[in-house]
């Protein structure tokens, strides 16, 4: 990991562990922020907090990684490298996403209307040399998740 401070922060119960405990599929979580803001680190810690013991790799080149943890399927999607939202059709996201799935999406703005709507939007940013996450619930599912993590 490049930034141990971020890994420690995102591994605390105030962030990824807490969200993972409260996440109930189906759920779509958009991860927004600049390059290096901690989106992938958060996703790794989130997936491990669900109980996945293996290596969680960045989906930057393959676009999509799939994990099964605690009876939940987690799809981790990174759209940074796509040039056209139509490229998502080749991944068959709609076919993979079901009632037992949590979908984590980095760079969701690049997915256009082909992505499932977000339940929760996490905005990663730095303030006063500290990494922070702003949480916005955009559905009733997201509001319930945000309420359980408060």
Name each model-derived stretch.
Residues 16-22:
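Pre-Walker A adenine-sensing motif
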Residues 34:
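P-loop (Walker A) phosphate-binding loop of NTP-binding proteins
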Residues 52-67:
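Short beta-strand-centered segment that lines the nucleotide-binding/catalytic pocket of NTP-utilizing
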Residues 39:
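Conserved lysine of the Walker
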Residues 29-31:
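Hydrophobic anchor at the beta1->P-loop junction of P-loop NTPases
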Residues 48, 83, 88, 94-150:
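Short phosphate-coordinating micro-motif centered on Lys-Gly-acidic
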Residues 1-4, 8-15:
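Short, small-residue-biased leader/transition segments that mark boundaries at the very start
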């Amino acid at each position: 990991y490049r930034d141990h401070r971020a890994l420690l922060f995102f591994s605390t119960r105030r962030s990824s562990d807490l969200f993972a405990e409260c996440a109930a599929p189906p759920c779509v979580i958009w991860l927004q922020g600049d390059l290096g803001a901690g989106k992938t680190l958060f996703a790794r810690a989130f997936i491990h907090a669900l109980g996945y013991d293996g290596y969680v790799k960045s989906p930057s080149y393959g676009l999509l990684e799939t994990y099964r943890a605690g009876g939940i399927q987690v799809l981790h999607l990174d759209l940074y490298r796509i040039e056209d939202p139509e490229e998502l059709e080749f991944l068959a996201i709609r076919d993979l996403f079901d009632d037992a799935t949590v979908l984590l999406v980095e760079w969701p703005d690049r997915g256009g209307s082909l992505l499932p709507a977000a339940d929760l939007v996490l905005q990663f940013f730095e303030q006063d040399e500290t990494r922070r996450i702003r949480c916005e619930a955009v559905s009733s599912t997201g509001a319930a998740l945000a309420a359980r993590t408060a």
